[in-house]
Amino acid sequence: MSMTPREIVSELDAHIIGQKDAKRAVAIALRNRWRRMQLPEDLRQEVTPKNILMIGPTGVGKTEIARRLAKLANAPFIKVEATKFTEVGYVGKEVDSIIRDLADVSMKLVRQQAVEKNKMRAQDAAEDRILDVLLPPAKDQWGNVQESDNNSTRQTFRKKLREGQLDDKEIEIDVAAQVSVEIMTPPGMEEMTSQLQSLFEGMSPSKTKKRKMKIKDALKVMLDEEAAKLVNPEELKQQAIEAVEQHGIVFIDEIDKICKKGEHSGGDVSREGVQRDLLPIIEGSTVNTKHGMVKTDHILFICSGAFQVARPSDLLPELQGRLPIRVELKSLTKEDFERILTEPNASLTLQYRELMKTEGVEIEFTKDGISRIAESAFRVNEKTENIGARRLHTVLERLMDGISFDASERRGEKIIIDENYVSEALNDVVENEDLSRFIL
């Protein structure tokens, strides 16, 4: 990650409106990963990441920041929900599985990079296999291949293959047979299932089977097979583990849902126990994965929660100490809603315009129409449950319902969505609190 904090914030601004503090905190944390890697080895081990706790109501951009960050980071990244985990010893996923899943993500990322690096060599080998099927090499009476006879023809076919002229021709090829092993285990033991499957698949002898397919599909299959031959699995494992340990990022959503609210007695397997299990992973421990042992000392953890019922102080004191950077995300205003409808690269109004354009219907949202949509969403949020920007999806779906249904019969029309159009479509629902509670 060589992007500066300003560049990271600018990239996030293209998709997320407002929340400057959260964007800055995330950008600094991401840049610090790069800064740390420039330090001498002995000092690098001492610099630990400053984990982040994002606090804010639902629908203000916490999860969206995580999604966009994953694309920017180009590093092993996983987003999980705290409510999915249970305390060790109970049925359900253990928190260690976060690191195992992160290692799997890293392995996939490293494999993709290795395949990309060897793409040219793999492409040539895959093309040779296709050409061997199309033009079996001529052999002399002793079984030796005579290359000179059909070399020019082979080059002609290779040119046609690269230009896509042979894409739809069907051929029969030998492909590696995938051995599928189905293992039934009780709920919460998915990790054991995947390990047993890997074990049995590794023990079974590699076989090939003949398959008939189009050349363009065969080329993809062979490209994957040839690329797999060019990479060293052991090297990949080492690179994947190093990538997790040095650059891994874990985003834990809904952390407020595992807080112990007030004086509560009795078994509570999904709350305080999960917090206790999270402590060693965030602080730094070693987790056994199928790719090897992973140290979590330098993995960056970003936690988020609405904290509408519980408060950050309801978290275990030890866990609070391991999340030193606190960022509060603000509730969205009517002006924020207007910007969300128009400013992001794939804004909601743009999505609807392009969707209707496929039916030959032109949609135009006027400025006063957008203002009225934003006002309607904001008012419904105030009067009922505040679900932030997600309310815009509900309001727009209600507004576009008739157009979406009749679009195929209105080809060639231009529909202008102005203040009057929005008022007619939404007024009854917005004004009636009981209706808006159930419909919007």
Curated annotation (Swiss-Prot):
UniProt-annotated location(s): Cytoplasm
Xref: HAMAP family: HslU
InterPro entries: AAA+_ATPase, ATP-dep_Clp_protease_ClpX, ATPase_AAA_core, Clp_ATPase_C, HslU, P-loop_NTPase
Molecular function in Gene Ontology: ATP binding; ATP hydrolysis activity; peptidase activity; proteasome-activating activity
Organism lineage: Bacteria, Pseudomonadati, Pseudomonadota, Gammaproteobacteria, Pasteurellales
Reported function: ATPase subunit of a proteasome-like degradation complex; this subunit has chaperone activity. The binding of ATP and its subsequent hydrolysis by HslU are essential for unfolding of protein substrates subsequently hydrolyzed by HslV. HslU recognizes the N-terminal part of its protein substrates and unfolds these before they are guided to HslV for hydrolysis.
Keywords from the named record: ATP-binding, Chaperone, Cytoplasm, Nucleotide-binding
Subcellular location, principal: cytoplasm
PANTHER family: ATP-DEPENDENT CLP PROTEASE ATP-BINDING SUBUNIT CLPX-LIKE, MITOCHONDRIAL-RELATED, ATP-DEPENDENT PROTEASE ATPASE SUBUNIT HSLU
Family per record: Belongs to the ClpX chaperone family. HslU subfamily.
Assembly and binders: A double ring-shaped homohexamer of HslV is capped on each side by a ring-shaped HslU homohexamer. The assembly of the HslU/HslV complex is dependent on binding of ATP.
Pfam family, one: AAA_2
Name of protein: ATP-dependent protease ATPase subunit HslU
Residues the entry annotates as binding ATP: I17, G59, V60, G61, K62, T63, E64, D253, E318, R390
Region (Disordered): 141-161
One of the GO BP terms on file: protein unfolding
Organism, scientific name: Mannheimia haemolytica
Biased amino acid composition, Polar residues: 143-155
GO-annotated cellular components: HslUV protease complex
